[in-house]
Amino acid sequence: MNFWYHLCWWLCRVGLFFWHPVFRVTGRDRVPAGSCIFCANHSGMAGPIWILLALPEKKMIRIMAKQELRRVPFVGWVMEKFRVIFVNRGAHDIAAYQQCIDALEQEHDKMLVFIEGTRCNRDKHVRAKTGGDVVGVT
């Protein structure tokens, strides 16, 4: 278990209680016990946090994120502590795909993939990128 992940998870849970006390999630009982991939829309900066807090897992959930975020001060450091899998979106990043497959098959982790590949306005329809589907069928 990752100390930083759990510390941040609990701090966010407490913050969420005060910031948005009515937080209702349905369907937690349908999340499989083993490894799986969650595909989500990315409509805002807090989206990944909301999703992680909504899931019933206490175990760290692996996230795929664009490679450029690794260079953002502090954010990149936090993401590395959370074992984020960074993806070069401009190429077929075989190493990132292999990390995802290993996380699912060997470590039995759950993964969170923002299938549109970027943040999008809720009113704007964006086609899903390829990549998340490749990991899912491998």
Segments the model singles out, each with a brief description of its role:
Residues 1-24:
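N-terminal membrane-anchoring alpha-helices
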Residues 17-138:
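Soluble catalytic domains of membrane acyltransferases
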